[in-house]
Swiss-Prot record:
Name of the protein: dITP/XTP pyrophosphatase
Subunit structure and binding partners: Homodimer.
Catalytic class of the enzyme: hydrolase
Family, as annotated: Belongs to the HAM1 NTPase family.
Organism of provenance: Thermodesulfovibrio yellowstonii (strain ATCC 51303 / DSM 11347 / YP87)
Coiled coil (UniProt feature): none
Binding site for Mg(2+): D69
Keyword Hydrolase annotated: yes
Cofactor: record remark: Binds 1 Mg(2+) ion per subunit.
Cofactor(s) this protein cannot do without: Mg(2+)
GO terms classed as biological process: nucleoside triphosphate catabolic process; nucleotide metabolic process; purine nucleoside triphosphate catabolic process
Annotated SUPFAM superfamilies: ITPase-like (SSF52972)
Organism classification: Bacteria, Pseudomonadati, Nitrospirota, Thermodesulfovibrionia, Thermodesulfovibrionales
Stored Pfam families: Ham1p_like
Length: 204
């Protein structure tokens, strides 16, 4: 069985593969299809962006496509960065640029008011037109300085609820147990185990 991940982000692809390991699925990515164009993430919601990417990749490859759109919502900032998380400091911004902007906007905000949540929306689109959405969340707070070298995105400044370490201070295995992406992928995994036989001819 084959599914194409609609992403070129190496670390994200590794995380998705790691969490989905054990299923009888060959996981490809758009890196295996260099002719595919980048999809502009201009949706107003996570599910709009995830579906847009998955639909395009499914249409172009003729294979089921899986797309993840994730972001950080900070309560003190009214839910920002939200769907703009990857481009918070600009369309060409690096992770460090985005973190710098976030911490500048939270300067002076006390620890108890730095609450936030990571959101993950996974879209799975099949060639027969069927579409499915899976959500995952993890609550926590924003640290005052970046800590750790693991992960990507805002991991160095996100401390999940019940922990003292940031995501970036955790091993991949530790993070996988509690992350927003893990929650969404667990729902996807359950779906595939239950319903994949229906789509076997499309997944081969």
């Amino acid at each position: 069985m084959k599914i194409v991940i609609a992403s070129r982000n190496r670390k994200k692809i590794e995380e998705l593969k790691r969490i989905l390991q054990g299923l009888e699925i060959t996981i490809l990515s758009v890196n295996d299809f260099p002719e595919l164009e980048e999809v502009k993430e201009d949706g107003l919601t996570f599910d709009e962006n995830a579906l847009k990417k998955a639909r395009y990749v499914c249409q172009q490859t003729g294979l089921p496509a899986l797309s993840d759109d994730s972001g950080l919502e900070v309560e003190a900032l009214g839910g920002r960065p939200g769907v703009r998380s990857a481009r918070y400091a600009g369309d060409e911004a690096s992770d460090d640029d985005n973190i710098k902007k976030l911490l500048e906007e939270l300067a002076g905000v006390p620890s108890e008011k730095r609450t936030a949540q990571f959101v993950c929306c996974i879209a799975l689109v099949f060639p027969d037109g069927k579409e499915y959405i899976f959500w995952g969340y993890v609550r926590g707070k924003i640290s005052e300085i970046p800590r750790g070298t693991q992960g990507f995105g805002y991991d160095p400044v996100f401390i999940p609820e019940g922990f003292k370490k940031t995501f970036a201070e955790m091993s991949p295995h530790e993070k996988d147990k509690i992350s927003h992406r893990k929650e969404a992928l667990d729902k996807l995994r359950d779906f595939l185990i239950k319903f994949a036989p229906i789509y076997k001819q499309n997944l081969l």
